[in-house]
Swiss-Prot record:
Residues 1-20 have a biased composition (Basic residues). The keyword Ribonucleoprotein applies. Residues 1-24 are annotated as: Disordered. This is Large ribosomal subunit protein bL32. GO terms for biological process: translation. GO terms for molecular function: structural constituent of ribosome. Keywords: Ribonucleoprotein, Ribosomal protein. The gene is rpmF. GO terms for cellular component: large ribosomal subunit. Belongs to the bacterial ribosomal protein bL32 family.
Amino acid sequence: MAVPKRKMSRSNTRARRAKWKATAPHLAKTVENGRVTYSLPHQAKVVTDSAGTALFLEYKGRKVADV
C-alpha cells in the first residue's frame, strides 16, 4: 500500500475534495393531458387519478407495479 512521504496541506486536501461534488440528475420532460412533468429517465413513474391519488407505477407505457 502506498504511503505519502509528506503531510498533505489543508489547501491541497480541500482542492482535491472539491472535485468530489455530485452532479444534478438529468430530467426528462413529458407532457400528459396538457400538464408538463419532469421525471428521471429509465425509472418508473407514478400514475395518478384526477384527485391526485396514486394508482400504479408505469414504465414505457406499461403498468409495472401497484402502489
